[in-house]
Amino acid sequence: MKTLLLLMGLLLSWESGWAISDKELQEMSTEGSKYVNKEIKNALKEVKQIKTQIEQTNEERKLLLSSLEEAKKKKEDALNDTRDSENKLKASQGVCNETMTALWEECKPCLKQTCMKFYARVCRSGSGLVGHQLEEFLNQSSPFYFWINGDRIDSLMENDREQSHVMDVMEDSFTRASSIMDELFQDRFFLRRPQDTQYYSPFSSFPRGSLFFNPKSRFARNVMPFPLLEPFNFHDVFQPFYDMIHQAQQAMDAHLQRTPYHFPTMEFTENNDRTVCKEIRHNSTGCLRMKDQCEKCQEILEVDCSASNPTQTLLRQQLNASLQLAEKFSRLYDQLLQSYQQKMLNTSALLKQLNEQFTWVSQLANLTQSDDQHYLQVFTVNSHNSDPSIPSGLTKVIVKLFNSFPITVTVPQEVSSPNFMENVAEKALQQYRRKSQEE
């Protein structure tokens, strides 16, 4: 009824060309403030929804971490078996050495030529230096190293070190971010609901009741060092939230600032050319991936020394079995590590949403420390009747959200429209949020 009387009064004033009275502007401000109040409630509700999503993502991360730990244990067991078999084989490497050495001398030229062709075609830069480095590497390598797939073992060990490093970095980021988020989400603002469903005033003085914090909580004592009967300073209460969200996001993104980990594949394929080029430049081991393309190199792998030393054949079989198992679990670990990294990216994105959604409300509320519930104040209203420069059918309104900068809004409606002030308030909030994000 009150809204209807307001519209009737505005319509009569409008058609008569009268200026809108202060009382009518005040009533329009009240109507617009109701919309702003609703949007603030929605924003705070979305903040809590994002918080729930972050918690769900963290639970998924914990399950994934258990799978990672299990895969790591199996991978390490297989690596230990591989190293054990390798050491036992090294103790008897003199067997068949003459046969292997002869084949190795024929294998090296083919391997070098094949590798350099690949490098010139795919990797391109620094072929001369790489060629010299490869020559030294092949001359210093033994056919026995080749025979026991030493390159695969070395690659596996290097990958294991990188995996451990990446996991440590990500866990450190998660631990620091989780500590901050635990403090942020514990039974305070995020667990309380508005008690006044008719008019929610999160920016009023404390005598209305704290809607966010349990005053007895440690966090509440930290951010509310003043007596409850003193005026409510929104900035003092919400600034810790803002700071903590920002700190959590920084912690989560820390690992992304470091050198990214390229998840390798164990086979030589066109899809991992970058990894092969890196290995060739680093220590030439990438060239050994091309042994399948050289006949004499393949013959070394097929040398059978069982006649001279039967136990060596068994040891080699054990080595190959444990090596394949270690490679299998290393690939599984890489897959889980990628999923874990994706959880970090998802959490970081949610923290960004939380930051953006929370910031505009806290910035808006920080503009006032009074008990005035008029979040939106209407200062002037003009249409074609009062200002001929305004096109017919449009209404120009100047408002303020609290004591912010003046916001000019133009809506394709007459003042008498039932949802006029709701549309004005919506456009004003949109402008305010855009400007807040730009700052």
UniProtKB/Swiss-Prot annotation:
Keyword Endoplasmic reticulum: yes
A matching Pfam family: Clusterin
Gene Ontology MF terms: misfolded protein binding; ubiquitin protein ligase binding; unfolded protein binding
PTM-bearing positions, type Phosphoserine: S127
Signal peptide: 1-19
Residues modified by glycosylation: N80, N97, N139, N283, N320, N346, N366
SMART domains: CLa, CLb
Entries under InterPro entries matching the protein: Clusterin, Clusterin-like, Clusterin_C, Clusterin_CS, Clusterin_N
Alphabetically ordered keywords of this record: Chaperone, Cytoplasm, Cytoplasmic vesicle, Disulfide bond, Endoplasmic reticulum, Glycoprotein, Membrane, Microsome, Mitochondrion, Nucleus, Phosphoprotein, Secreted, Signal, Ubl conjugation
Post-translational modification: Proteolytically cleaved on its way through the secretory system, probably within the Golgi lumen. Proteolytic cleavage is not necessary for its chaperone activity. All non-secreted forms are not proteolytically cleaved. Chaperone activity of uncleaved forms is dependent on a non-reducing environment.
Subunit architecture: Antiparallel disulfide-linked heterodimer of an alpha chain and a beta chain. Self-associates and forms higher oligomers. Interacts with a broad range of misfolded proteins, including APP, APOC2 and LYZ. Slightly acidic pH promotes interaction with misfolded proteins. Forms high-molecular weight oligomers upon interaction with misfolded proteins. Interacts with APOA1, LRP2, CLUAP1 and PON1. Interacts with the complement membrane attack complex. Interacts (via alpha chain) with XRCC6.
UniProt family annotation: Belongs to the clusterin family.
UniProt function note: Functions as extracellular chaperone that prevents aggregation of non native proteins. Prevents stress-induced aggregation of blood plasma proteins. Inhibits formation of amyloid fibrils by APP, APOC2, B2M, CALCA, CSN3, SNCA and aggregation-prone LYZ variants (in vitro). Does not require ATP. Maintains partially unfolded proteins in a state appropriate for subsequent refolding by other chaperones, such as HSPA8/HSC70. Does not refold proteins by itself.
Protein name as annotated: Clusterin
Species: Bos taurus (Bovine)
Taxonomic lineage from the root: Eukaryota, Metazoa, Chordata, Craniata, Vertebrata
